[in-house]
Amino acid sequence: MTRTTVLGTRALGRAALARQSLLDRSDVPVLDAVAHLGGLQAQEPQEPFVGLWSRLRAFDPAALSDLLTGRHVVRTHLMRRTVHLVTADDALAWRARHNAMLRQRVLGTYRRELDGVDLDELAAAGRAVMADGEPRSMGELARAVAGRWPEPGPRALGEMLIAALLPTAQMPPRGLWRTRAGVRNVLLSSWLGREIDPLPPDGSGPDGSGPDGSGPAGSDPVGQALVRRYLAAFGPAASADLRAWCGLAGLPAAVAAMREELVTFRDERGRELLDLPDAPRPDPDTPAPVRFLPAFDNAVLGYHDRGRIIDDAHRGLSVTGARLVLVDGRTAATWTVEDGTVRVAPLRGFSRSERAAVAEEGRALAAFLSEDDSDRVEVEAAP
């Protein structure tokens, strides 16, 4: 029997940083970076700009704004039912695979309010309203159909329509660089001029099982593509990590169908880790530069076991919207911006060299965020 290689926390952390372009900034075009990362969480509209600045050399925020207005990337509800900034191609290819999960997650919040509502009829009514191509807020769409379904209330109707039943895109100017704008939604097909890709007729159900979720599984080709893309940007990783990233139930049929093309490891807890054979797995002692992460960055949220990036004691920071600072590849501080000054709050003591490196990267971030009006940074005393 061949013994499976065990990868320690530091080795997994360095692999994650390498895949995420956080170990060494990349020179790839912005669109390619968004595609490689499988999108960026974007519920806070300005955060993807910081995420890409930390990953790309000479990142020009205007390039991302141009991709949004040019309809090459879109802001849409997708993984985990959260707003993600993804390429137009990925939005169309992946949306149908996420439909069942999106419905279930909204029902998990509004099951009582939506009891008795025929969701297919609600979807048809919402689509009819949106067919004119006019951008609408969630509330406007909900009120347009509320006469037929008065009981659920506009919030439940709007969430189900915008976040689940109708593939929609959030229109610019929301999401443009240094721009504040409310959410206005249009049908994804209207905005991109293409319908979403239908699921292949291979028998796969919503979670990669049989058509009813319990019978024989198909090969789930869309799921296989998701697995490959996830491992390229996040691996090595367990099935639970994959589910934490996308919200889908582990993609068991997809993983089973492609096992022969994957390699396996184990972590120190004994979990099986899957990976692409030729993906980078740097030496655990590879130096890791200071990096500033935006709120809700998938480098942290894209795992069930986030221990490769953040200590269990600080795990709660990753889901409350705290912006994190990585020192030696691990979460060591949080950061905010006040009046053009980047303020860093350490979670542990820094050596003199670490403090200097944090200050240097913080000055560069302040200059980026202010378009060179300020390079002020303040590093607070350690707790």
Stretches with model-predicted labels:
Residues 1-306, 312-383:
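Long, low-complexity intrinsically disordered regions
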